[in-house]
Amino acid sequence: MDSQRNILLIALALVSFLLFQQWQVAKNPAPQATQQAQSTGAAPAPSFSDELDPTPAQNVAAKAKTITVSTDVLTLSIDTLGGDVVSAKLNQYSEELNSPESFVLLQNTQGHQFIAQSGLVGPQGIDVTSNNRPAYQVSADSFTLAEGQDELRIPMTYQANGIDYTKTFILKRGSYAVDVVFDVANNSGSEATLGMYAHLRQNLLDSGGNLAMPTYRGGAYSTSDVRYKKYSFDDMKDRNLSAPNDVTVNWVAMIQHYFASAWIPRDEPQAQLYSRVINNLGDMGIRTPNKTIANGDKAEFEATLWVGPKLQDQMAATAPNLDLVVDYGWLWFIAKPLHWLLSVIQTFVGNWGVAIICLTFIVRGAMYPLTKAQYTSMAKMRMLQPKLQAMRERIGDDRQRMSQEMMELYKKEKVNPLGGCLPILLQMPIFIALYWALMESVELRHSPFFGWIHDLSAQDPYYILPLLMGASMFVIQKMSPTTITDPMQQKIMTFMPVMFTFFFLWFPSGLVLYWLVSNIVTLIQQTLIYKALEKKGLHSK
């Protein structure tokens, strides 16, 4: 197998990979937790959605007072009617490149609703009816984390039937995790029974993305049985989410490209999963078991809301397996170390584009023995071509005999006929893993390289990098020896750089940069290896 056929192999693998990823995003399998509840015979958790008024509140934020809470990284709008987070702006992430507007993750507008709701339900619950929720009292209309202050607390109070309810939001400097604590003081003269719920509500939208950049927008969850499982909007429409009673819920989330929102129960091993869809609005959340509070006693319910970018270190510290929302696919065990190495390099060079170049040299340097073995094997195969041709003329159409004698010749000459193919197959997982490492890295979002590349996570606006990449492939093709004589195969090989260029027009600039630099390294390594082969008497042409 010569290097031009390797290019064809890469192309086929690349196209197959892209089609598979697009299918995987579109056809996500049903959640494993539900399947376990059905297959093991364990009784599923009771449907919490039956406890709530099935009519969702319509634009609640427009009907009630909202307060603003600001830290260095978050600006939240909280509705005093129920204490829902109806808007979340990420102060350190812009909506668009060079835009002064912060990225809005949660919002409650006429065209789109994505909010984080939490409340108390049960016999003495105050949030059972969507349109009759508690009107909390709060001391001010806005709260700001002051300079030198590390924590900001916003208590909201409500009193009904002799029971005092306090809902407190706790935000910390530099953190996208918001603690939500309910304190209940029962002075009603009798027992009070209630539990907490917390869910995310969102319009059920399409996943988005394209063939080059397939992205997932939908739900996900983690339990003691399932470390990470996607629960798509289509799944949500088809069946309500539930899990066995003995399963511990780690978190539930709604995720999108680069960003995630999640509810994490605190000290509640019996919290239950649930979901429901009403009028194209999907709820996905957790429900804690009821607590019975004696007269004169107090109780506390707590959950944490993550609302921010997919930052792996912070998410891993917030909840078990929450960092898995950074989905590297089935080659995560390669992609995760690559992302770690890329981040380490960036801390030294200060530019993500330069870090990608350095990573490319490191990866290609590590794979140099494979590359050398590939070219050496191809050179040996070319040296055998006269003998193979003579063998074909001598044997004729007897394929079985031809195969036997070919294998004997390979064994005698110590040549592996797959030696030129296997190295390139081993390199493909590296490329695919790096593809996902770059695709899922929020750090690359709006990160510049130099010149016209202002965002490594977006396609090249002038298509210069893809064109350079295509040109480099053409040069590699011309420099590579070939034994292809079939006219059709020759046409396919000639067209291959054009096809690659077309595909890469829509790839993130960071990934195209990697492929371009990788091609340049290939040209350098190819030149050095050919010179070494010529010295050994193995012709490179």
UniProtKB/Swiss-Prot annotation:
Keyword Transmembrane helix appears in the UniProt entry: yes
GO molecular function terms noted in the UniProt entry: membrane insertase activity
Domain of life: Bacteria
Topology of the protein relative to the lipid bilayer: Multi-pass membrane protein
Biased composition annotated in UniProt, kind: Low complexity: 31-47
Biological process, per Gene Ontology: protein insertion into membrane; protein transport
Main location: membrane
Transmembrane residue ranges: 6-26, 343-363, 418-438, 456-476, 497-517
Region (Disordered): 31-55
Keywords from the UniProt entry: Cell inner membrane, Cell membrane, Chaperone, Membrane, Protein transport, Transmembrane, Transmembrane helix, Transport
Protein location: Cell inner membrane
Gene Ontology cellular-component annotations: plasma membrane
Role played: Required for the insertion and/or proper folding and/or complex formation of integral membrane proteins into the membrane. Involved in integration of membrane proteins that insert both dependently and independently of the Sec translocase complex, as well as at least some lipoproteins. Aids folding of multispanning membrane proteins.
Record family assignment: Belongs to the OXA1/ALB3/YidC family. Type 1 subfamily.
Subunit annotation: Interacts with the Sec translocase complex via SecD. Specifically interacts with transmembrane segments of nascent integral membrane proteins during membrane integration.
Name used for this protein in its record: Membrane protein insertase YidC
